[in-house]
Amino acid sequence: MKGLRCLAVLTIFFLTIPCVHAQTKKITAAEAKDHIGDRATVCGKVASTHYAKNSKGEPTFLNLDEPYPKEIFTILIWGSDRGKFGTPESEYKSLQVCVTGKITTYRGVPEIVANEREQIEIHK
């Protein structure tokens, strides 16, 4: 009986490894539109930024590869999490970055909400 339990645990463990890996595949900002609802790592150059301090939620927008208003992908940082990022609108501007999280859309533009600094990696 103990052997069957061990076998079941190992089977479940090895069956979940490919799923976890597949959920965090690396894609470009342009490819994000084809992965809505997926967890992924999206990479691109921060083309424009904006801190909307007078808007509800005080969002900061980091647009990858194309500047606003023609953005193709946005990293959204809410004001409640902003302190974890310093001044993201200046710290990340013009840098190559990758962000990991669930891809959603807002007004037709794919985005990932970054709640933790570790979600955004700078690539030089």
Where are the regions that the model predicts?
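Bacterial N-terminal signal peptides that target proteins for export
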Residues: 1-8
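Bacterial N-terminal signal peptides
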Residues: 8-17
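OB-fold single-stranded nucleic acid-binding module
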Residues: 23-124
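Sec/Tat signal peptide C-region and signal peptidase I cleavage site
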Residues: 18-22
